[in-house]
Amino acid sequence: MAHKKGAGSTKNGRDSNSKRLGVKVYGDQPVKKGGIIIRQRGLTFKPGINVAVGRDYTLFALQEGDVKFETIADRKFVSVIK
C-alpha cells in the first residue's frame, strides 16, 4: 500500500480573455464615420439615427457627428447628430 496519496489533477486553472465590451464613445462626444460607439452582446442599446448594427451587435456611426443617448419607452437608443 502506498504511504502517500497520488497527485491528482484539477479541473480548475482556466480563464477566458476579456472581450473589452462596453461604451467606447460617450454622449456629446464626436465620432467619425465608421467609428465604433458600443461593443455589446445582444441589442442592449438599439441603433438610432445614423447608427448601424454589426453582426456581433456592435453599434457604429454611419456618418460624422456627436453621439446622443436617449431612452424611449424603456428602450435605449444611440444616435449620431451632426
From Swiss-Prot:
BP-aspect Gene Ontology terms: translation
UniProt entry keywords in alphabetical sequence: Chloroplast, Plastid, Ribonucleoprotein, Ribosomal protein
One term under GO cellular component: chloroplast
Keyword set includes Ribonucleoprotein: yes
Annotated localization: Plastid, Chloroplast
Region annotation Disordered: where it falls in the sequence: 1-22
Nucleus found in the keyword field: no
Pfam families linked: Ribosomal_L27
Domain of life: Eukaryota
PROSITE patterns: RIBOSOMAL_L27 (PS00831)
One term of GO molecular function: structural constituent of ribosome
Main localization (coarse): plastid
Family: Belongs to the bacterial ribosomal protein bL27 family.
Matching NCBIfam families: L27
Annotated protein name in UniProt: Large ribosomal subunit protein bL27c
Natural source organism: Chrysotila carterae
Gene, per the UniProt record: rpl27
